[in-house]
Design a protein with these regions (language model features):
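C-terminal alpha-helical "lid/dimerization" subdomain adjacent to the S-adenosyl-L-methionine
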Residues: 26-29, 48-49, 167-225
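Helix-to-beta-strand junctions that scaffold the AdoMet/dcAdoMet cofactor pocket
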Residues: 90, 147-148, 161
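Core SAM-dependent methyltransferase catalytic element
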Residues: 219-240
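A short acidic, Gly/Pro-enriched loop at the edge of an enzyme's catalytic core
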Residues: 128-137
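Conserved class I S-adenosyl-L-methionine
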Residues: 5, 9-64, 80-84, 107, ...
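A short SAM/SAH-binding and catalytic strip from SAM-dependent methyltransferases
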Residues: 137-150
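Class I SAM-dependent methyltransferase SAM/SAH-binding core
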Residues: 72-129
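A short glycine-rich, Lys/Arg-flanked "PGG" loop and its adjoining helix->strand segment in the class I
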Residues: 152-163
């Protein structure tokens, strides 16, 4: 897949295409197909649940962004997090949203156009091989569960920024939430590589792997849990 350059405030942020590997192409195709099909519904759901459990605000707070910073969101989807990220960096900062799914990006671009944001850009690219060279902060919400190599992916994100915040579902401890998550993963078995075996155990393993990557690459990692413990936010910080 070829990544597209992102334009912000008259300048260009260099983006590079990921290595061409059959496994990566197959995974990317599954993600594009699944999320592209449900883009409109996902857009509504993401905005309707923006404030549930304080997850979104907690993620942004954990990034510790300052006015003028550059923040990249991998798996930005229809742009539900863009408003709070832009507010955090101010008009002098930059927000870059990266997603692999065209219909999602079209909805995000519509949001940016309606708001008239000149310092928010969007790039189509694969988050597993980050198409952005550097930033002050990186955010990814409910993304790493899609990656069989979540440890390596998050490690590459840590190469791009000194602050990396990852939010994931934690399929343990709450029966109703686990049942809903199990059902969603089963319906989208190809998306989660979950055609066989214990899908909840697989999701838990990928959440653990993303946290382990932060532990290995960052100086400190803070973990908080939300919504009856079903959502985990891990914030990695590299001391300057």
């Amino acid at each position: 897949m070829v990544a597209e350059d992102a334009t912000v405030g008259g300048g260009r942020i260099a983006v590079t295409p990921p290595p061409s590997r059959t496994a990566d192409r197959d995974r990317a195709g599954r993600i594009r197909e699944s999320y592209g099909r449900w883009a409109r519904i996902y857009d509504w759901f993401a905005r309707a649940t923006a404030s549930v459990g304080g997850v979104r605000s907690s993620c942004v707070d954990a990034l510790g962004l300052a006015p003028g910073d550059t923040v990249v969101e991998f798996g930005c989807g229809p742009g539900a997090n863009l408003p709070v990220l832009r507010e955090a960096v101010g008009p002098g900062g930059r927000v870059v949203g990266v997603d692999i799914t065209g219909p999602m990006l079209r909805r995000a671009r519509g949001l940016v156009a309606r708001r008239g944001w000149e310092n928010v850009s969007l790039a189509r690219g694969d988050a597993t091989w980050p198409p952005v060279a550097a930033a002050d902060g990186v955010l990814a919400t409910f993304v790493t569960s899609l990656f069989p190599d979540a440890y390596d992916v998050v490690g590459r994100w840590c190469d791009r920024a000194d602050r990396v915040v990852v939010a994931n579902f934690v399929p343990r401890g709450h029966r109703a939430a686990n049942a809903a998550l199990w059902g969603f993963a089963r319906v989208n078995a190809r998306l989660f590589d979950a055609a066989q075996g214990d899908v909840l155990a697989q999701l838990a393993a990928r959440t653990d792997a993303s946290r382990d990557a932060l532990d290995a690459r960052m100086d400190t990692v803070e973990t908080t849990r939300h919504v009856f413990g079903t959502i985990e936010i891990n914030a990695g910080l590299r001391e300057s």
